[in-house]
Structures are given as structure tokens and as C-alpha cells.
Regions:
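Sec/Tat signal peptide C-region and signal peptidase I cleavage site
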Residues: 32-38
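Intrinsically disordered, low-complexity Pro/Gly/Ser/Thr-rich segments with frequent PxxP/GP/PP motifs
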Residues: 92-127, 216-246
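Terminal connector regions
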Residues: 123-164, 245-290
């Protein structure tokens, strides 16, 4: 998002949460602006725990790999994953963990080459129903990075990075299903609509193959993407440059499997659907999963 006031521009760098990466360096956004700042990584980017006697704990590690001291504040936001846009902050929600969460420190100083920990402690009230309670823990520099371009315009870069904290009360788990597939002709992307009818979030990756008449057109893998309970996501299968497609009108066969859960306890769901690519300017209807 870009804000400008006369000769001063303030940029809030779009939020990156740990959905596709095992770590995320704040310096990526700062270097994009031509700045040289502290390189800071956050791990883990996703914490999933079950309550034990109503309590759950977690730890976030913030590491400074640069030669400059990093000063930041730590805060929490309620969130969901929007069907098309992904991460979305919420003022509050029934699944908001914040009323039951304590964490410290809320401000920290990370000297070069060191790691600081943020400790999370959730205490769920006995009266709360079984389910998932979640929040995003953000780390944000106390001072924005200021850069000046060749025209003398000053820009402030504010970067934040988040770790998702999921606390589950009771025996709750995700339940994914593939609903439909459609071809986005304008973006030249395959969109797979996946629903989660369970009571816990899931981060699913997808292995997929597209065929026409028995001939393989393209195969690929899509990275983990979060889907909240009773929610759905339009997942883009061919995200990367190497997976770009230019499909001719016709009917194609899309098959593959969803994979989610821990490495030692993966859940798998195979799927097989027809994908119709219309001719001309007609808009394709989503193709539902074969029953």
C-alpha cells in the first residue's frame, strides 16, 4: 500500500507470512528499495499446538544475521485466509486467540549475530467450545527505513513479518475436499477451489498433472497454502514462471493429490477433474469434481 504526502512517500510493504517459505528475511523488502539494513529472520513461521489442561505454549526465534542492531515491536492480529486474496487482518473473530494470549517481550533489541525469543502462552477458558483459536504474531521495526531517490523524494519503508499461532482445543482436525477447477484465461492460470469443512486449519501442497488425450501437457507442484476451518481457497496451480501455460480451446484432464499435515503423518487426497478451455471470448464455468 502506498501513501504519499507532498514530497514524502510512505510504503507499508505487503505482509509476508510463512506460508510458502521456511524462513523470511526482512531485508528482502528493504533491499528492494535500495536500502542496506539489518537482515532478520523469523522462525518458525507457523506454530500448531493442542491445549493441555487449557494451556498451550510456543516460542518464536528472531535472528539478526547482519552487522547492525535490530529494534522491533511485537504485536498480535486476528486473521483469516480470504478465498482469493489470502491473508486478511480482522478486527476480531470467534476464533481470535488474542483475549487468551500472553507473550513477551513486546519490544526487543537484537544485536548483530544473535537470536532473541518471543515466548507465547495461551490459557483458554474452560467455557470455550472445542475448536481452533488463532492469531498472527508480527515483528515490526521501531523505526522505518528512509531512502531518497534521484529526485529528492523521501520514502519510508515499513516492513513486518508474521508467525501464525494456532491453538486447538479438543479433537479438531481439517477435512479438505476439491470442489472445482477453472481456467483463468486472462491470467493464464489454473484455479483449483479447495474447501475445508473441518474445524482446524490446514496448509496443503498440491502435486498435479494436466493431460489432453493421454498426452501430458504439464506437471507441477504448488507450495503450502493455508485454508481456515469452514473456509475455501482458490489455489493457483501454475504459479511459477516455468509452469506458464498457453492452452488451446478444448477439454483437458487434471489429476493429482492434496497433501497436508506433519511430515510423519501426511494426509493425502487424490482428485481427478475435467478442465474446459473455451474458445473465443466465452467465460468457462468451473468444472466440479467427478462424483
Amino acid at each position: 500500500m502506498l501513501f504519499s504526502n507532498q514530497n514524502v512517500g510512505v510504503i507499508s510493504v505487503p505482509i509476508r507470512t510463512a506460508l510458502h517459505l521456511s524462513s523470511w528475511a526482512l531485508s528482502a523488502a528493504l533491499l528492494w528499495a535500495g536500502a542496506s539494513e539489518a537482515q532478520v529472520s523469523l522462525s518458525p513461521l507457523k506454530i500448531e499446538v493442542k491445549t493441555n489442561r487449557g494451556q498451550a505454549q510456543g516460542v518464536i526465534n528472531i535472528t539478526n544475521t547482519s552487522n547492525e542492531t535490530f529494534r522491533a515491536r511485537v504485536y498480535a492480529e486476528s486473521f483469516t485466509y480470504n478465498r482469493d486474496k489470502g491473508f486478511e487482518s480482522l478486527p476480531s473473530s470467534p476464533s481470535d486467540l488474542r483475549p487468551y494470549l500472553q507473550f513477551s517481550p513486546r519490544e526487543l533489541v537484537v544485536p548483530p549475530g544473535t537470536t532473541r525469543r518471543v515466548r507465547l502462552n495461551a490459557r483458554l477458558a474452560p467455557s470455550l467450545p472445542a475448536g481452533e483459536y488463532r492469531t498472527m504474531i508480527f515483528t515490526e521495526p521501531l523505526k522505518p527505513n528512509t531512502v531518497k531517490n534521484g529526485n529528492g523524494i523521501t520514502t519510508n519503508i515499513i516492513t513486518r513479518v508474521g508467525s501464525a499461532f494456532f491453538v486447538r482445543k479438543g479433537d479438531v482436525r481439517p477435512n479438505l475436499m476439491v470442489d472445482s477447477v477453472r481456467w483463468n484465461a486472462e491470467a493464464k492460470k489454473i484455479q483449483l477451489l479447495v474447501r475445508n469443512s473441518g474445524k482446524a486449519s490446514a496448509y496443503t501442497s498440491i502435486k498435479w498433472t494436466l493431460k489432453q488425450g493421454g498426452t501430458v501437457v504439464k506437471s507441477g507442484e504448488s507450495p503450502d497454502t493455508g485454508i481456515v476451518p469452514d473456509g475455501d481457497r482458490n489455489l493457483i496451480l501454475n504459479q511459477s514462471k516455468k509452469d506458464e501455460l498457453a492452452l488451446s480451446p478444448g477439454t483437458y484432464q487434471l489429476s493429482g493429490e492434496l497433501l497436508w499435515g506433519e511430515d510423519n503423518d501426511k494426509s493425502k487426497l487424490p482428485f481427478k477433474l475435467d478442465l474446459t478451455v473455451p474458445g473465443g471470448n466465452s467465460t468457462p464455468s468451473p468444472t466440479r469434481k467427478r462424483r
